């Protein structure tokens, strides 16, 4: 009986322990990296999703503009005093009317999105590049109020209700030359620097976000996606 009890209480043999250790080692080498990449994959996914949302918003504004102004022959008749840009007919998105199109004293409204004869989204504000960020913020659901987060310092703005850090990457305050970058808050710290985001940036280990440069009259907006640093 003592022998049977002893056999029933016996543990793993040395060979069995070695086999278990080897199996755990294989799992650590093959499976662990896949789990570690989940955050990176998630960041890359949301970045691509935001880029798609921006493209869709720009295309929507362009389509509505073409339907509104496409056959009216209004090019060159009006100048908006806020932006100072020549040869553009401007009205508030979804609020276009004859009064908007005939008044040369028409003023832009903060926080609104406007249509132009070029068909690309623009802001009616007169404070330059930093404020034109509102044009895109107003079209996206990022937990950012377009009338509140209008200027972004060198460290970017990280609204508490948003999952994004937003940078003003404009080199000057010319309304024709404004740009911004959106970086996920969950991205690696190495990616949270606006110097890595421009129209000339190459996607690299330090980039994880979306770069947007506003339209310049007939030119379409520039939208670039960076995911290698996510």
Residues of each region from the PLM?
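Alpha-helical hydrophobic helix detector
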Residues: 18-33
């Amino acid at each position: 009986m003592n022998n049977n009890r002893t056999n029933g209480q016996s543990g793993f043999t040395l060979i069995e322990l070695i086999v278990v250790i080897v199996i755990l080692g294989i799992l650590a080498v093959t499976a662990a990296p896949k789990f570690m990449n989940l955050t990176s994959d998630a960041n890359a996914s949301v970045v691509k999703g935001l880029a798609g949302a921006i493209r869709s918003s720009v295309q929507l504004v362009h389509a509505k503009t073409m339907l509104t102004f496409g056959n009216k022959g209004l090019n060159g008749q009006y100048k908006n005093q806020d932006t100072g840009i020549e040869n553009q007919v401007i009205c508030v998105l979804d609020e276009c009317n004859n009064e908007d199109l005939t008044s040369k004293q028409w003023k832009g409204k903060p926080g609104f999105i406007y249509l132009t004869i070029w068909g690309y989204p623009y802001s009616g504000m007169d404070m330059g590049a930093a404020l034109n960020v509102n044009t895109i913020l107003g079209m996206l659901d990022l937990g950012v109020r377009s009338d509140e987060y209008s200027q972004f310092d060198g460290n970017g703005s990280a609204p508490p209700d948003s999952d994004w850090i937003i940078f003003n990457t404009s080199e000057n305050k010319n309304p024709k030359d404004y740009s911004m970058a959106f970086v996920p808050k969950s991205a690696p710290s190495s990616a949270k620097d606006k110097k890595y985001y421009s129209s000339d940036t190459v996607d690299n280990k330090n980039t994880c976000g979306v770069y947007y440069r506003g339209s310049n009259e007939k030119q379409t907006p520039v939208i670039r996606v960076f995911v290698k640093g996510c």
